[in-house]
Structure formats: structure tokens, C-alpha cells
Design a protein with these regions (language model features):
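A short SAM/SAH-binding and catalytic strip from SAM-dependent methyltransferases
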Residues: 103-116
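Conserved Class I S-adenosyl-L-methionine
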Residues: 19-20, 46, 162-255
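A short glycine-rich, Lys/Arg-flanked "PGG" loop and its adjoining helix->strand segment in the class I
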Residues: 117-132
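A short acidic, Gly/Pro-enriched loop at the edge of an enzyme's catalytic core
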Residues: 92-103
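A generic alpha-to-beta junction signature in SAM-dependent methyltransferases
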Residues: 31-33, 54, 127, 174
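Class I SAM-dependent methyltransferase SAM/SAH-binding core
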Residues: 38-93, 118
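Conserved class I S-adenosyl-L-methionine
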Residues: 1-37, 48-52, 69-72, 132-156, ...
Length: 255
């Protein structure tokens, strides 16, 4: 867990998380979070989903591996006047009793835990009968993946991350314990320029920050140029940049 903690403690993740707002809203709305629901936000990050669930009256707990992110989540909750419990911990080994949550949610978070079987077992264990489950998972981005492969042999997000973007894998992991539904989605990343997107990712996306730390100055600049060139291909007629990122939305109900 120490390596993951180091990776996810870097950068200003809250800036990137702000771009996920439409998906965060979608998740909370589809899960029907309401007053009194006991909600667990897995890999809560800087707390965006947790705060939205609390606004709806949920009794919310968020857990994350990175204390710097949790500190920002606590600040955000305090600004909102939201009473949220934030715990430092590993989503593969949750420090909670059996069947103690009505809603389990994760927005592009729990998918980064490497042991999928452990994650699935823990989701089932802490969910009460009839509990609602909702999480989002990135689908492969072939062009971006090819770019990163020019700088590292290993996928920067981890080899297993995109498995969660496959319906058959989710069924294999969770189908025994949850009735599952799936919905494809696209998140549009918009900016005035490709350079603006580079600044966002190089300062706020922990896997990209970790990759940059592994490269010397010349290779970092090479990655910078390649990244900007890629996103320049998403120029719109009005001169801005609008790039799609596909994801899978998973909804479930505990059997």
C-alpha cells in the first residue's frame, strides 16, 4: 500500500476531480442517495462524491489510501458544513463491520486497487442486503495508451485498471453477490488549448506525475510535446480542445 499511497499523494488532484463533476452528479442521482442512507465512498480522493452524497442527507464515510487527499476532502466538507467521516485505509481491506452500508460508491477510484478479487469480496461484505452499488471505470484509450507506451513498459495506471471497464470482468467479480446493470458513458475534457490539458494532467493526475518522476529532463520534455500534439488533434471549430474519454457506469443491488 505504501507505493500506492506515495503515487496518490502527489499533485493537486482536486483540479482534475472537478472535471469529473457531471459523472459524480450522475452517480449520486442514479443511486438515489437520500436522508439516512449509510454511504461508503471508496477511494474518495478529495471528497467530491462524498460531499454530494452528504448534501442529499446521506450519513457518509469516505476512505482513501492517501492522507494528503483526505486532508483536502476534510477541508471541502468543512466548507460545505457537511459532517463526513474520512478514514485512511486500503479498499482491499476495509476496516468496517459486515453489512453496515446501504450505498457503496466510487468514482474512478476503486478501479486502481490491484487485487480485484479482494475488492469485490470487501464490497459484498460491507453491503447490507439490498444495498445499492455504483461505480465508474475507465475504458481503454488506445491513442493515449500508445503515447505512454513510448515512455514506459507498464501502463501508468496499472495493468488491471481497464479490466473494470469490461462488463464480463465486472460480472465475474461481482455477479455472484450483486444484480448488475451497465451503462456506457463519455466524459468530455474541454480546454482552451492542448497545453492547458497538459498542465492539468502533469500537475493533477497522480499516475502522470509518477511517470514524469521516472524520466530525465529530455524525456519529460519529449512526453510533453507528444501529449500536446495528441490533444491538438481534438481541436474544435471555435479553436478550443474537446477530447472524449469513455467509461463504464456500473450499478448493482446486493442480493
Amino acid at each position: 500500500m505504501s507505493e500506492a499511497r506515495e503515487v496518490w499523494s502527489a499533485g493537486t488532484y482536486e483540479r482534475l476531480a472537478a472535471r469529473f463533476a457531471p459523472v459524480q452528479e450522475q452517480l449520486v442521482n442514479l443511486l438515489g442517495v437520500s436522508r439516512g442512507d449509510r454511504v461508503l465512498d471508496l477511494a474518495t480522493g478529495t471528497g467530491e462524491v462524498a460531499v454530494r452524497a452528504a448534501r442529499n442527507g446521506g450519513v457518509v464515510t469516505g476512505i482513501d489510501v492517501a492522507e494528503p487527499m483526505l486532508a483536502k476532502a476534510r477541508e471541502r466538507a468543512a466548507e460545505e458544513g457537511a459532517d463526513i467521516t474520512f478514514d485512511l485505509g486500503d479498499v482491499e481491506y476495509l476496516p468496517y463491520e459486515d453489512a453496515c452500508f446501504d450505498v457503496i460508491v466510487s468514482n474512478f477510484g476503486v478501479i486502481f486497487a490491484p487485487d480485484h478479487a479482494n475488492v469485490a469480496a470487501e464490497l459484498a461484505r460491507v453491503s447490507c442486503p439490498g444495498a445499492r452499488l455504483g461505480f465508474t471505470a475507465w475504458k481503454p484509450n488506445p491513442r493515449l495508451g500508445e503515447l505512454y507506451r513510448g515512455f514506459t513498459e507498464d501502463p501508468i495506471e496499472g495493468r488491471e485498471v481497464y479490466e473494470w471497464g469490461r462488463e464480463d470482468h465486472v460480472e465475474d467479480m461481482l455477479g455472484e453477490d450483486f444484480e448488475l446493470e451497465f451503462e456506457d458513458g463519455t466524459l468530455w475534457l474541454e480546454a482552451d488549448s492542448a497545453e492547458e490539458i497538459w498542465q492539468l494532467f502533469s500537475e493533477s493526475a497522480p499516475p502522470v506525475i509518477a511517470l514524469l518522476k521516472q524520466l530525465d529532463e529530455a524525456r519529460r520534455e519529449e512526453l510533453h510535446r507528444a501529449f500536446v500534439q495528441l490533444y491538438e488533434s481534438y481541436r474544435t471549430k471555435d479553436g478550443g480542445v474537446r477530447a472524449p474519454r469513455r467509461y463504464l457506469l456500473v450499478l448493482g443491488r446486493r442480493k
